């Protein structure tokens, strides 16, 4: 997922996507603790996707203020 894909979405869509990605991150952490996660790098990717979504949300809010 790239920032360019996210910046065209509405705030509501971004917040729904953020909620889904946070749930995915939680599931990955549970799998990691249960030793069922085959690729621990997926946690890093999920965290970065969450950061990208938060950046897009903040950009929408800052552009609407101006």
UniProtKB/Swiss-Prot annotation:
Q: Give one GO biological process term.
A: translation
Short name of any one Pfam family annotated for the protein: Ribosomal_L29
Molecular function GO labels: structural constituent of ribosome
What GO cellular-component annotations does this UniProt entry give? Answer: cytosolic large ribosomal subunit
Top-rank taxon: Bacteria
Give the PROSITE patterns listed for this entry: RIBOSOMAL_L29 (PS00579)
Keyword Ribosomal protein assigned: yes
Q: Does the keyword Ribonucleoprotein feature in the UniProt annotation?
A: yes
Which keywords does this Swiss-Prot/TrEMBL entry list?
Ribonucleoprotein, Ribosomal protein
Fetch the PANTHER family from UniProt. 60S RIBOSOMAL PROTEIN L35/50S RIBOSOMAL PROTEIN L29, LARGE RIBOSOMAL SUBUNIT PROTEIN UL29C
Membership in a protein family: Belongs to the universal ribosomal protein uL29 family.
This chain belongs to which protein, by name?
Answer: Large ribosomal subunit protein uL29
Organism ancestry: Bacteria, Pseudomonadati, Campylobacterota, Epsilonproteobacteria, Campylobacterales
